[in-house]
Amino acid sequence: MKYLEKNINLVQVKKDYAEEESTKLSTKSPSQAQSTSNGVEQFKMKYREKNFLSSFLDKNCPSFSEDFELTKFISCGGTGVVYEGQMRKKKNKQKLAFKFKFSKKQNKDKDEFQEIGILKKLHNKNITNIYAFTKVGTTMHYCVLELGKHGDLERFTKVLLKRKVLPETILCYFAFQILEALEYIHKCKIIHNDIKQGNIVVDANLDIKLTDFSVSCTYANFDPDDLVEFPFMGTSKYICPEILGHVQMAVKEACKIDLYSLGVTLYELAFGKYPYNLNEIENKDYNKILNNIKTEKLEFPKDKKISGLCKDFLRGLLEKDYKQRFNIQQALKHPWIQGAKIINEEKENVYCLESFLINIITDNIPKFNEYIKDENKKLERSN
């Protein structure tokens, strides 16, 4: 990607974006900082202090500094922080992700390490790998994970591509990979529960990796027809209406929880805003979010170049009634997603990744464009 960065002058953009994100996190008012007394918020407020994390680890886990070095801050979540780093003693300085997670209950909660157990069980090209896991004291643990070179989808779009939205070709390319990852975890009877841009990273090969299984749940002990009220987890504007409304649903329909969240994510990537006019609603106003989903129509901005075929696919994912919503097989068989096969062929035939990226961000894959036109005509005739 050095070629691309040199030619579209992204180095300063990356720096500016990182500083902007850091400023957002480091300028909270005292009242905000005092809104919670747990160690998580205190830690998040201090991460910008020089050598704070290194000093903390030197005191509580001396072996960490012997084995690893942290190079830069990546992100801050609800229960901890993520840094980029590498092994000290290896000649091959492979970049790694270090996720530090704090607990309120001194790790007495059996769910505290659920993410670790899930990641150890999952082995798929579109799911991030876990390499190591260590407890630090009684209230913190860290895991060493595969690093997505180009960051999450939000950073990939805004920083690398310098865009507010993704062109349809690359949107289709990523959507297909996310669906394949979801198909795999659903076969393992796992619901991710927090599909969004921040939990989908892009690696050096321009492939996506699903990450952050901290609020995931398993349903291996249930029968397919069992009625279950699934836990209220995830990020509010990505949560499906049946979860917001505390509706019991059959376990066999559980995959549709993630598919709705994927629909919100793809809509946001395509149009730069949430569906159902959710942008102006506070994240914690769950009743208002649910009311908007129930009462607002699913509309698509007319000023965006998105095909009718793509919109038809999004309608299937964002169906309010989960019984009518796409399941994973319906989503994978949709004509729009099938177009990803053409994009993958293009990737195999190009001489370098830079050329492939330029083609997909400029919608310059003629075979895909012709395919979409033909399928659009079929869709129009059927309607």
What are the roles of these predicted feature ranges?
Residues 71-78, 82:
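Protein kinase glycine-rich loop
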Residues 100-122:
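Conserved N-lobe beta3->alphaC-helix segment of eukaryotic protein kinase catalytic domains
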Residues 129-141:
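Short beta-strand micro-motifs within the conserved protein kinase catalytic domain, predominantly
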Residues 139-152:
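Conserved short submotifs of the Hanks-type protein kinase catalytic core
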Residues 174-175:
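Activation segment signature within eukaryotic-like protein kinase domains
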Residues 186-203:
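Catalytic-loop of the protein kinase fold
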Residues 203-236:
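Activation segment/activation loop of eukaryotic-type protein kinase catalytic domains
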